[in-house]
Every structure is written in structure tokens, then in C-alpha cells.
A protein has these predicted regions:
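Solvent-exposed loop/turn and edge beta-strand elements of beta-rich ligand-binding domains
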Residues: 1-221
Length: 221
């Protein structure tokens, strides 16, 4: 009689945590108990198969670089069982999450109407939008450095400087804040005699806003 041992087969899946679909573009490797690399590859839309791993031995699946817009997953350890069945293991990647606030100088109130743009390290536009009364939420920004730029300030506010920020390798919500100061003007009021055009003394005046609220009251002596 001749006995033939069937080779073991391991199927490794790299998936999107939010959709469950296969995630292409991640760099992965499998190492043995001694830390030697057994196989390495870049994920595609299909599961990756490895044959003839040793029964009873432990292996580790490690993500060396996540796909763009995703976070590096924790390594997975698995042991090869004595079976001809396909042994399946799945590694899931979460997405990056960034929340951007456009507020007044106090940081307490969101300001609608600002035209904002996110630029990458190559000054390429990643996303543009107009601010509202709620923070702007962005998912799947690749890990790295970015610039938040105000292209146009809301009415009554001053255009502010760029804000640089870095998207870290984490699935937690990362917050970015840009603050606008109010526009401040100066009003010069001259009260003159209609005939002589000389300044008049003893004049009182009030400065009111559009709703009639008194902003200032002065007397000319």
C-alpha cells in the first residue's frame, strides 16, 4: 500500500471592516515561529492561498503597510491543523476618520459659509466643501500629512492661515480645528457745519447695529 499525505492549504483574507469585502493594496507577510518570512504579497480582490505549511506549527500574519485610507491591523497568529480542508483566516482593516471643525475664535460655535480645501503633501486637492453648522467628517484619508486651507472666509470673518495636520495610523476619530476671527473695522464720523464745513461742538451721536442695538455713544466737545 502507498499512503500519500495531502498538503495543507491556508486561505488568508484581507477585508474592509466596514463592508466585509476583499481589500486590495495591503502589504502582508506570514512568518514562522522563528520569525522567518514564509510568504509575502500585496492583497488583491481575491483571498491569498499558501500551501504546505507544517502541521502543528504556529504562524503569524502581519500587515506591513495598509491600503490607502486604512489603518494597520493587529497581527494574527494561527496554528496549522492536520486536515486537507482549506483553513481560513481573516484580517480586517478599519478606515481612518477625521472630523474638521470650522469655528469662531472662541472655538465654541461652528461657522457656516467658509470654503475649505484639504491638500496632500504634493499640494493636490483631496477634498473641498463649504462649512455648515456641523463639523465636516472625512473617511479613508491615507496616513500622512495634510494642509487645511480656507479659500474664502464667511461674511464678517477674516481669512485665516493654513492649518497643517497629520492623519495617524488609528481607527479613532481624529479632530482638526480651524478658527476664524471676526472682521474689525474703524468708523470715522465728522459732524460739520453745512455752511462753513467746520467741526461742530456739543454734538451727541449713537452708533447702532442693524437691529437697533446701541453699540457706542459719544459726545463731541
Amino acid at each position: 500500500f502507498t499512503f500519500e499525505n495531502e498538503p495543507t492549504t491556508v486561505e488568508l483574507t484581507k477585508s474592509d471592516l466596514t463592508t466585509g469585502e476583499e481589500l486590495p493594496g495591503a502589504h502582508l507577510k506570514v512568518t514562522d515561529e522563528a520569525g522567518n518570512t514564509v510568504d509575502e504579497w500585496t492583497s488583491t480582490k481575491e483571498a491569498h492561498a499558501i500551501n504546505e505549511l507544517v502541521v502543528g506549527k504556529k504562524y503569524k500574519l502581519t500587515e506591513t503597510k495598509p491600503a490607502d485610507g486604512f489603518v494597520t491591523a493587529e497581527s494574527i497568529e494561527f496554528t496549522i491543523e492536520n486536515t486537507a480542508e482549506i483553513q481560513k483566516h481573516e484580517m480586517k482593516d478599519d478606515v481612518t476618520k477625521v472630523q474638521i471643525s470650522k469655528t469662531d475664535i472662541t472655538g465654541d460655535q461652528e461657522i457656516p459659509g467658509a470654503k475649505l480645501t484639504i491638500l496632500d503633501e504634493n499640494d493636490q486637492v483631496v477634498e473641498s466643501w463649504t462649512s455648515s453648522d456641523k463639523p465636516h467628517y472625512v473617511e479613508k484619508l491615507p496616513i500622512g500629512k495634510y494642509t487645511l486651507r480656507e479659500e474664502q472666509a464667511p461674511k464678517g470673518f477674516i481669512l485665516t492661515n493654513d492649518v497643517t495636520f497629520e492623519v495617524a495610523d488609528t481607527g479613532e476619530i481624529q479632530t482638526v480645528s480651524m478658527k476664524d476671527d471676526t472682521a474689525k473695522g474703524k468708523v470715522i464720523i465728522n459732524k460739520t457745519d453745512a455752511d462753513t464745513e467746520k467741526p461742530l461742538k456739543g454734538v451727541e451721536y449713537e452708533l447702532r447695529d442693524s437691529k437697533g442695538k446701541v453699540l457706542d455713544r459719544k459726545s463731541v466737545v
